[in-house]
């Protein structure tokens, strides 16, 4: 059930679902697994807010276990395409593809709540048991290319070398907010609501 908020206007009461009300304040909630429908919704909201006023920041709150690489990269590409700065605020967890999205916020405007966590690891995927040998080679090549792309993005977003990212992402690498700050994926740990 999606909560509804009621506002008093000069014409009486007006009700909004909570996400529509947050959108009026340029807040987008990226929660749950990253998949195509969710990504399309996030992208549409980013484009709408940028078209409305590209001089104001957009606030993207992130709490996701990760998910589809192609859907996540579509969000990242849109964040980079629009003129509005996108502030990212991690609450709960930014794992896997979520780290790519959250760390791609505007430099100096990437935040994390004190008890949130970050996870980097290599992309998952593979060929099913009914896959032909030649298709397995194609899948393996695509997976390596995807890993290289994601490692380059993480290196650019953190200031670490691609080699360091490759080493750290070999296995699940969990980070606290403080560790994420020291690693370079965020710019500040938020102790209170100090967004401007």
Curated annotation (Swiss-Prot):
Q: What is its main location?
A: cytoplasm
Q: Where is the active site?
A: 96 (nucleophile), 121
InterPro entries in alphabetical order: ClpP, ClpP/crotonase-like_dom_sf, ClpP/TepA, ClpP_His_AS, ClpP_Ser_AS
- Name the Enzyme Commission number(s) assigned to this protein: 3.4.21.92
Instruction: State the Gene Ontology terms under molecular function.
Output: ATP-dependent peptidase activity; ATPase binding; serine-type endopeptidase activity
Enzyme class, top EC level, equals: hydrolase
Question: Where is this chain's protein located in or outside the cell?
Answer: Cytoplasm
Gene Ontology cellular component annotations, sorted alphabetically = cytoplasm; endopeptidase Clp complex
What catalytic activity is recorded?
Hydrolysis of proteins to small peptides in the presence of ATP and magnesium. alpha-casein is the usual test substrate. In the absence of ATP, only oligopeptides shorter than five residues are hydrolyzed (such as succinyl-Leu-Tyr-|-NHMec, and Leu-Tyr-Leu-|-Tyr-Trp, in which cleavage of the -Tyr-|-Leu- and -Tyr-|-Trp bonds also occurs)
One GO BP annotation is: protein quality control for misfolded or incompletely synthesized proteins
Q: Name one Pfam family in it.
A: CLP_protease
Q: Which UniProt keywords apply?
A: Cytoplasm, Hydrolase, Protease, Serine protease
| Role noted for this protein | Cleaves peptides in various proteins in a process that requires ATP hydrolysis. Has a chymotrypsin-like activity. Plays a major role in the degradation of misfolded proteins.
Q: How does it assemble?
A: Fourteen ClpP subunits assemble into 2 heptameric rings which stack back to back to give a disk-like structure with a central cavity, resembling the structure of eukaryotic proteasomes.
Q: Which family does it belong to?
A: Belongs to the peptidase S14 family.
**Name under which the protein is recorded:** ATP-dependent Clp protease proteolytic subunit
In which organism is this protein found? Answer: Streptococcus sanguinis (strain SK36)
Taxonomy, top ranks, is: Bacteria, Bacillati, Bacillota, Bacilli, Lactobacillales
